[in-house]
């Protein structure tokens, strides 16, 4: 596993951890939880598009997807399956853009 793959796996695991933390904290605010999700997804997108020849356009498209993914996860009460679905939704497209 190369460095980029390790970093992607780390970020995906971090996203799982953020969702687990959300479930454990009843008083966790919507704003804070979504900011955390956005930051992790943003790092994942940045990591995967940094070497892409059209990385600015790729990032714009992926950031729109990131917002939708965050809303999807939140609407499904931060369910594990919803979060994994969002990662799978973004990740295959990231690999195609390279």
From Swiss-Prot:
Domain of life, per lineage: Viruses
Short name of one Pfam family: Rota_NS6
GO CC annotation: host cell mitochondrion
Compartments in which it is found: Host cytoplasm; Host mitochondrion
Subcellular location, principal: host cell
Sorted UniProt keywords: Host cytoplasm, Host mitochondrion
Disulfide bond residue pairs: none
Subunit architecture: Interacts with NSP2 and NSP5.
HAMAP family attached to this UniProt entry: ROTA_NSP6
Similarity-based family: Belongs to the rotavirus A NSP6 family.
Protein known as: Non-structural protein 6
Species of the source: Rotavirus A (strain RVA/Cow/United States/WC3/1981/G6P7[5]) (RV-A)
Taxonomic classification: Viruses, Riboviria, Orthornavirae, Duplornaviricota, Resentoviricetes
